[in-house]
Amino acid sequence: MRAAPDALRIAIVAPPWYSLPPKGYGGSELVVHLLHTELRRMGHDVTVFGAQDSEPGVTMLADAEWSHDLGGPDHSARLATYLARVYDALGGQRFDVIHDHTGFEGLLLALYSGAAPAVVHTIHGELVEPMSTFYKEVHTRARLCAISLSQAAAAPTLRIAGIVHNAVELPAAPPSSSHERYLIEVARITPDKGQHLAIQVGQRAGRKLILAGKVERTRDGKRYFEEQIEPFLSPMVEYYPNVAGQQKARLISRAAAGIFPLQWSEPFGLAMVECMVAGTPVLALRTGSTPELIEPGVTGFLAEDVEDLVEAAARLDQIDRVRCAEVARERFGPHHMTERYISVYRRGSVEVEPLAAPSAEIVEVLSRQPAAPTPQPSGR
């Protein structure tokens, strides 16, 4: 595509764990895929680094089998190897912006590489100590982006350049009002995701439940599945360990609702948004980012406990599934996310765009943060 007159030269460093786009798991990789695709469509000059088996146009510097080391004892060594390859490949090139998605290691290298006057970094995980302490050491030099207001609120003194909600791939098919009666939770099998509570809701609501996701590869994850999930599997509680592509899309679009009884403050729920853009409303506990993502009565219902979730399941017929999809697609499409990142690239900050009213504290923190200098397109 022909470059726009005001095109920026952008280097995007994706995580090294999964391909772009991911073939199954890989939420951060999906976001990077959607972002760089849309940036190129808009005429920007984009260089992307990622893992093997990625789409054309990605410089592949991480071995495919490294995905097995994610979160394991070799995690740090694999990430360091990948980042060394990335910055060797960059060489003496100059960019307007480096946008890092890899974590604090990649952010440090981007800041000290001198390859771009502006370094943008998306915080994809939970913003807790000691991560917040690290970010406070560099937040005046990097443009930090949070993926939700609730994530940013965990470190209210941290300078945040913008709240940019993640995007999902929009279904090609138009939303339909027809569906089946089952509930679905698409998530890793782990106590944090609350699948044991989803089972309780399904039983009490008289609805079949589908659990789709890999068992977390930890001792606690395996024990959780063996003790609290596996004994309840039956024709009314089905388990799909590997879902992706058309099978995943079909299961989501045919469900009466997605159910997410989360037991932690998840900074952003991609699976919830995937449900909503398909026209499938979401039932979720009020925690983390769920009040920002779900518009009660339009794209789903928020609940305080299991009893509330059961009651909400009885009101699903009140949701207009076509309207649910329309609202979600407008808010969480790739173009909207990309425009907000471009605002951060150019101006150094972007207006906060919450669905629910944020706390006065976080609004004050975000409103008083100064904009960073605007990068000028580099000569090519």
Identify the function of each model-found stretch:
Residues M1-R380:
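Catalytic cores of nucleotide-sugar-dependent glycosyltransferases that transfer UDP/GDP/TDP-activated
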